[in-house]
Amino acid sequence: MMFGGVGMATLPLSLIFAFKNRPKCVITRAQYVKVMAWQEVTDLAKRSNELGSPTRRKRLEERTKVSEKCEESPADQELVFLEDDVQALNEAFPQGEKADTSWALTVLFYLAKLVFGILGLALSVIWLLHIIVFMLVNPPAFPFLNQVFIQLDSAWGLLGTTAFAIFCYYLVMSVISGEMHSIYPMK
C-alpha cells in the first residue's frame, strides 16, 4: 500500500524531472570537442587509470585469496560513478556515423518522458480524488471513476474497458516505481 502512494508521486515527477534535467545542446559538437571534450575525456581516463582494470583486481584477489569488502567498496563505487559519467557523456554528445539520428531520438525520448509525466500526474490526481471521494467517505459521496467507466462503456463497448486497463496499468507502474525508488541516492 505504501509503495503505491510513493509511486504515485515519484513516477510522474521523476519523468518530468528527467525532462527538466535533460542534456541540452547549447553549442555545436565541434565547439564542444574543441573546448570541453578533451578535458572530460582526460578526466575520465585519469579516473579509469586510477581504478585499474577490474580483471587485474580479480586476479590479484584470486592470488591472495583474501576478499575484504572494505577494500573493494570504494573502488567498485568509483567504477559505478565512472560508468554513469561515460553514459551521460555519450547521451549528451553522441558520436559515430549516426550521431544526428541518435541526438534526435534522445530529444524525442525526453519529450515522451515529459508527456507521460504530465499524463501520469493527471492520473495520480484522478486516483487520489477517487480514493478520497469513494473510499474514505462512508457512505461514498459519489461513484466517481466507477461512473466514468460505465459511461465510457455505454459510449463504445471497449472504451470503458480500455480506460479501466490504463488506470490499472498505471497503478501497477506506480507501485513498481515506488518500490524501486531509492530513499537515499547512494549507489
Curated annotation (Swiss-Prot):
Cytoplasmic topological intervals: 120-125, 177-187
Keywords for this protein: Cell membrane, Membrane, Transmembrane, Transmembrane helix
Pfam families: LMBR1
Cellular component GO terms held in the UniProt record: plasma membrane
Signal peptide limits: none
Localization annotation: Cell membrane
Its membrane topology: Multi-pass membrane protein
Residue ranges crossing the lipid bilayer per the database entry: 1-21, 101-119, 126-145, 156-176
Record carries keyword Cell cycle: no
Extracellular compartment segments: 22-100, 146-155
Oligomer and partners: Homodimer and heterodimers.
Family listed: Belongs to the Casparian strip membrane proteins (CASP) family.
Protein's recorded name: CASP-like protein SELMODRAFT_416718
Organism: Selaginella moellendorffii (Spikemoss)
Lineage: Eukaryota, Viridiplantae, Streptophyta, Embryophyta, Tracheophyta
